[in-house]
Amino acid sequence: MPPDPLLDEDEQYASSEDSDFAPDDAPNQASDQSDVEDEKDDGDKSTNKRSRPAADEGAADAGYDNSGDEAIIKRGEKRRKKTQTRGVNEDEDGGEGGLIKTRRQRAAEKEERKYATNNEPVTIDVDALWAQMISKTPVPGTKVDEPTDTDTNTDPTNKKVASAVQAAGSTDSDDASAMIRIKRTYNFAGRVHTEEKLVARDSAEAKLYLASQGDVPPTEGPEKRATRKAFRSAFEPQVDLMPQRSDLNLGMAARIKAGKEVQAKKLNVVDKSRMDWAGYVDKEGIKDELALAGKSKDSYMAREDFLAKSEAMRDEDSRRARLAGKV
């Protein structure tokens, strides 16, 4: 088999004899290409850097007079806008992880925002408020007029007014305690009588009542408030509007009345005449005349006539009471 001519040529070929063979020039060419690319990038950056100073110089000139607070305020406004837009986006998009919020969750979030801290700028003058607190001056609109002793002592009209007020208070208290309420239930001539009247404390009836009660005036406590019924539901039947059966009472009203009659105090003719006489004295207004007649020593005949008339009046009252009892 004849030898392959191509293989022979490869074996006989020497790369060093080739005119294009330059192993030292390859890294130089690669470095040249990288240098060209770096120069292009540096050129672009330098153009960008050179074009920026115009805008930067304008911004610096615009904010030359600013003290720095304006920038802080602008930053705060930007943050608030971001939080507001973020909250709107969260409400529209949903919760975390893309979950859809229900109406209840949104309502709860709105309620929480109502009680959230207020980040708005403060409008109150803190320095003026602090100075006012230190000076301890009264807040306008809360004046309290306190009467001083010097004014009351120097002004005679104030003394008169004070004395008049004290006199009025004493008369009011006297009027309140000068009246007494008489309430009694007694059994006379087979009938139960109930009386309730308001009379003067120094009247004959009041004195007789206090004497019968053992000089102990009745203590009237505060009236008890009636118990309120619970509100009726719209679904409950109206039982109260239904007619009640009278035959189911079984004479309870009569029993209660009989119990009161048993508890009533029984009066004889003398006690009833004494009560009627006290009422007559108060009605005719002869209390002072009786007091004068009792103190005088020279009117023996007048006293005898007066006692005779009184006895006749008592007999007439007792006779009428007996006739009323028989009927």
Swiss-Prot record:
Region (Disordered): 1-122, 136-174, 210-230
Domain named BCNT-C: residues: 247-327
Chief place of localization: nucleus
A Pfam short name: BCNT
Residue stretches of biased makeup (Basic and acidic residues): 106-115
InterPro entries attached to this UniProt entry: BCNT-C (IPR011421), Swc5/CFDP1/2 (IPR027124)
GO annotation terms (biological process): chromatin organization
Ranges of compositional bias, category Acidic residues: 1-23
Keyword Signal applies: no
PROSITE patterns in the cross-refs: BCNT_C
GO cellular component, one term: Swr1 complex
Record keywords: Activator, Chromatin regulator, Nucleus, Transcription, Transcription regulation
Places the protein is found: Nucleus
Summary of subunit composition and partner proteins: Component of the SWR1 chromatin remodeling complex.
Family statement: Belongs to the SWC5 family.
Job description of the protein: Component of the SWR1 complex which mediates the ATP-dependent exchange of histone H2A for the H2A variant HZT1 leading to transcriptional regulation of selected genes by chromatin remodeling. Involved in chromosome stability.
Name under which the protein is recorded: SWR1-complex protein 5
Gene source species: Gibberella zeae (strain ATCC MYA-4620 / CBS 123657 / FGSC 9075 / NRRL 31084 / PH-1)
Name of the gene this protein is made from: SWC5
